[in-house]
Amino acid sequence: MTSNSCLISLGLLLVLIQILAPAKAAEHSVFTHKNASSVLGQLVTSSTLVWESYDPKDATQLQFAVEGGKYVTEDEHYPMYVCRVPIDGIQVSGHTEKILQRHVCLAAHYKHGKYDNFDVLMNKGHLGKVGWRHWRKFDAGVPVGAIRIGDDSYIGRHRAPSQPNKDGVVTHWGADFNLGHLEPVGLGKIRVIEAEREKYYDDGEVLVETEPFRYELRDIKLDRLRTDIQENMTELVTRKLENLEDKYSTVETILSYTFNYNQYWGSHEGVARGLPTKIFEKDEAVPAEINWALKHTEKRSENKAVHTKLWPGTAINVTLRGNYVTLEAPYSGKLFAFYYGSDESVSRKISAEVRKSYLKEVKLEFSPVYWIENGTLVPTTTTTTTTSTSTTTHATTTSTNEPTPINEPPLVHMKDNGVQHSGPDTLEKTLHDSPSSNELNSHEAPENMSSDPGKDVALAGFGVNAAGSTFIAGSALLTLLLTIFLSL
């Protein structure tokens, strides 16, 4: 009976796991045209766009989809999104259309079918500008940044024709644009489905993506509750100070060493990997320059001048040890994207993790004084007693070879020589200013997103899955159920 109860409980647990586990839509790469000077062109994988399989259960999925136009009816106006479906083994572009509470893809194909299973073009990072660019057959080839669809064509559209009604007023019901594709054969043409028939046009619009050429990261704040700092004392350099003269004198040397300064600022969905990025940290006059999502290492060097006074024929060993620190922490910040041909930037709040390794401080250590000749330690002054036949006690001083025994260890001095790079990192300083939690609303739109409804360009934003809260609640419930099951 007990075994049956366990089996039933296990079955229920597996069913709940299937129900509560968030399903992630499949994603596929997007290719764009990047070389307008060649006939064939060069295809490059987009760092900000993806094709994502449509999930009718995800009510928030389409908030980051690329718009292809508007659908107008007497009852409602709603955006159409760029989609694709495989027909006879070839990907065909189209636009979405609402049927009740779900969407279908209306393919730009002579079969003119409506498909339930399709991919939607998603601007996941929205730090790449996506917009429709006017095209005509006398233009020089395929526009740079055009988004490829199928074997050798690019996503295009043409405005749907409007007809005056009986009162002479021009109105339009349905899709304001017919989506299709640009065929670059010869001078090129845009093919769409219009009135359920294929039509070709010498002009229209082509969907293009403009990626940023650099980033800037500002307003950085660490989450101090989750900051981890590890320290490790490392030997940097060891040197011998020796007096080869015949008198008590000062000896000095320069100690040189190198160390690595590493920094990695994490990655983020939709942000181009490897793009030049300037990091503006608090109290840093000059921003650090890295490549986004790549580890950046600098080889740094420092010099320390060390001196002391020694007796003839003696020496000491001096060692510099460094406190090497590794800091890891979640952080929030504002990422700015910059584009060629535009003075405006697009900014977005992001959250990621930073990891830094740096030399925080340098300490001096030195050995006891020893003889250069045989390496034995030079003794210090001591007092002993000897007893004579008259039992008189005399204080005497014992000594070894010259020089006279030293009374105390020498003072060793160290000072900086040249530019110094070690010291507490600026991120450590921000820990005193950071709140205990820096969570941001990932759904916020970019602060400088265009509010002009007539400007058909998709800008800034980071794709998120609103099912995250459901997943957290589901995880808690699964933990509870698992605990109950194990107790049976």
Curated annotation (Swiss-Prot):
S-S pairs: none
Its membrane topology: Single-pass type I membrane protein
Annotated region described as Disordered, given as residue ranges: 380-453
Compositionally skewed regions (Low complexity) per UniProt: 380-400
Keywords: Developmental protein, Differentiation, Glycoprotein, Membrane, Neurogenesis, Signal, Transmembrane, Transmembrane helix
Residue intervals on the Cytoplasmic side: 487-488
Gene Ontology CC annotation, any one: plasma membrane
Primary localization: membrane
Glycosylation sites: N35, N232, N317, N374, N448
Transmembrane segments: 466-486
Biological role: Required for normal axon patterning during neurogenesis.
The name this protein goes by in its record: Protein unzipped
Taxonomic source organism: Drosophila melanogaster (Fruit fly)
Phylogenetic placement of the source organism: Eukaryota, Metazoa, Ecdysozoa, Arthropoda, Hexapoda
